[in-house]
Swiss-Prot record:
NCBIfam families: Gln_ase, PRK00971.1-2. GO terms for biological process: glutamate biosynthetic process; glutamine catabolic process. Its EC number is 3.5.1.2. The lineage of its organism: Bacteria, Pseudomonadati, Bacteroidota, Flavobacteriia, Flavobacteriales. Belongs to the glutaminase family. It holds the Pfam family Glutaminase. Homotetramer. Keywords: Hydrolase. This is Glutaminase. Substrate binds at S63, N113, E157, N164, Y188, Y240, V258. GO terms for molecular function: glutaminase activity. InterPro entries: Beta-lactam/transpept-like, Glutaminase. It is an enzyme of class 3 (hydrolase).
Length: 304
């Protein structure tokens, strides 16, 4: 398979001029990102790399970070985690308050904001320094100590994060938050501010394509059954209320973020990351969705 030729074809066929969406504006720092940015990186099971465009430029990964924190929480709690979270697609916007009242404070899945905040509560409760340990986890699975939080983005999120603060308070009132609100939202804003490139993300997500092992060293990080559950959740819940569309068009487990990044995996084959900050009405990268659909069409390879 000539992945580089396929990526070059995608790069030639697509442009930011072809999409009509907008860069995220509700977080002030994200609104400053150049809408022309576009990059893609494929990391294969034989350790080959293929890329184009702005694939080495860091951006705010936002909700993609929820996959990392879920993996950490599952290592800590195992199956007991699902006493506090459900595993169903939500069908509502990612920051919705509505479902919580009807479902007694149990978030519909770990990738909507309410679910990710319950995960944050668990990590704040059980880890001595959750910010440090999350960064160490991501650096380890990526093999790159240059990954960092973007302090400016974290502060920008905090300045406008009233709905997330409301979510934590509401879940706490319903009995599914243990810690104080402030450290939970502080950790959450920092995790979303993680700055990574497509190249780094494709390497990090290879553990989900490689049965929980770091490809280069074969070190076991996650149990295979943990990876199976995370991949299933990415397939059904990884794209806000557009998960069905992504499965239909692309056909792989993946996760998006409002920073414009998308990561997807084909188990035992590759991990692919794409970044374009222009979002569609559902908060997913418009050009990224199109690029990944074209990628699986041209390769003829998906999980279906």
């Amino acid at each position: 398979m000539d992945y580089q030729q396929i990526l070059d074809t995608i790069n030639d066929e697509m442009s930011y001029r072809d999409v009509t969406g907008k860069v995220a504006s509700y977080i002030p720092e994200l609104a400053k990102v150049d809408r022309r940015k576009f990059g893609m990186h494929v990391y294969c099971g034989d350790q080959q790399h293929f890329s184009f465009g702005d694939s080495e430029e860091n951006f705010s990964i936002q909700s993609i970070s929820k996959v990392f924190t879920l993996a950490m929480a599952m290592r800590l709690m195992g199956e007991d985690l699902w006493d506090r979270l459900d595993v169903e697609p939500s069908g509502d916007p990612f920051n919705s308050l509505t479902q919580l009242e009807y479902e007694s404070g149990i978030p519909r899945n770990p990738f909507i904001n309410a679910g990710a905040l319950v995960i944050s509560d668990i990590l704040v409760d059980q880890l001595e320094d959750p910010k440090k340990e999350l960064l160490e986890f991501v650096r380890k699975i990526t093999g790159d100590d240059n990954i960092h939080y973007n302090e400016t983005v974290a502060a920008s999120e905090k300045s406008t994060g009233y709905r997330n603060i409301a979510l934590v308070n509401y879940i706490k009132a319903l009995g599914n938050i243990k810690c104080d609100v402030e450290p939970i939202v502080d950790f959450y804003f920092y995790q979303c501010s993680l700055a990574m490139s497509c190249s780094q993300l494709s390497k990090a997500f290879m553990i989900f394509a490689n049965k929980g092992r770091i490809l280069e060293t074969d070190e076991k990080i996650l149990k295979p059954k943990t990876v199976k559950r995370i991949n299933a959740l990415m397939q059904t819940c990884g794209f806000y209320d557009e998960a069905g569309e992504f499965s239909f068009q692309v056909g792989m487990p993946g996760k998006s973020g409002v920073g414009g990044g998308i990561v997807a995996i084909h188990p035992d084959n590759y991990s692919v990351a794409v970044w374009s900050p222009i979002l569609n009405e559902n908060g997913n990268s418009e050009l990224g969705m199109k690029a990944l659909e074209r990628f699986t069409t041209l390769t003829g390879v998906s999980v279906f």
